[in-house]
Amino acid sequence: MESLKELYKIGTGPSSSHTMGPKKAAEAFVKRASDADRYKVTLYGSLAATGKGHMTDVAILSVLEPVAPTEIVWRPDISLPFHPNGMRFEAFKAEKPVDEWVIYSVGGGALANEETAKNPPANIYPMTHISEILEWCNREGQTFWEYVEECEGPGIWDYLDEIWTAMCETIVRGLTAEGVLPGGLKVSRKASTYLVKAESYTDSLRSRAKLYAYALATAEENASGGTVVTAPTCGSSAVMPAVLYHLVNTRNFSRLRILRALATGGLFGNVAKTNSSISGAEVGCQGEVGVACAMAAAAACQLFGGTPSQIEYAAEMGLEHHLGLTCDPVCGLVQIPCIERNAIAAARAFDAN
């Protein structure tokens, strides 16, 4: 398995596969064809079907247009064989083709194609199944975050510290922002309202309403194209931060314990990414919000003092009750049902404990 640095990434919403990935691809292509006087980008399959709502064209044009005029072609009727999120970049000079590149956005902001599949990145983790890792934990008398440190080295904590800071900053921004989200559905931001209303509720309702507010804050920031952390994706980026932020504010957990919880949750997300997929276009929302709920449930269970077996069971419950969940955004926007789905999944992560 790859490093958690390839799972948790700071980027802009609303979609890691439809925004972050295509922008990253455009940046790579412009480096290899910087002297072109015209670009053409053809989007296939899911990228073309929902790309307008996900601002795929905006992400690509923000990179290529300053260099040369760029044409975007939408082909939702064609799916390339490697992955539903296919892109073809073409560069022209004096109307003659000078470069062509086919690449796929495979989820979580990652890129791949047939060539990269032949030369996969170096594995950081020798074990790729939770059953194997759980056996290691029981044998060594250690837990999941210690396995992460064993494989990644102590430098992972500085990276996770940056990730946690970014998550908190997103929530704070989202809690103070108001107005209507872009895209035409006229969805109003609700996070700040939920937070205010929470103070008038009794204890249990107040706690649940605040959790919803924290999740809505990140999900709404993502929907507006703001800065978020993939956990494991942009579309599911609100679940893990909401759960951990809520626990910090209600239980006063130390920053170190939160970072360890991030490591544990990330490990479960990494296993799902490695053995299946976290791409909504490929496996539906069960691979995004479902995996995010599993990650958050595992992180919360660890903070509550759970054993490795209990942590694994919490993650299992977080995922299994999202199985079959489709990726079905209204008008292709990461808003309905995506925003509220993050909030409900955050609550389910607690229910799993």
Regions found by a protein language model. Name each.
Residues 4-12, 23-45, 53-54, 68, ...:
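Non-transmembrane, aqueous-exposed alpha-helical and coiled segments at domain scale
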Residues 59-74:
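A glycine-rich helix N-cap at a beta->alpha junction
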Residues 264, 272-342:
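Hydrophobic alpha-helical bundle architecture
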Residues 168-284:
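Accessory "access/gating" subregions that flank catalytic or transport cores
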Residues 8-26, 225-243, 285-293:
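Conserved phosphate/anionic-ligand binding catalytic regions in large, soluble enzymes, centered on
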Residues 70-201, 209-210:
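C-terminal regulatory domains involved in ligand/effector binding and gene-expression control
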Residues 19-32, 241-252, 297-305:
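Alpha-helical support elements that line or immediately flank enzyme active sites
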Residues 192, 344-346:
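C-terminal auxiliary extensions adjacent to catalytic cores
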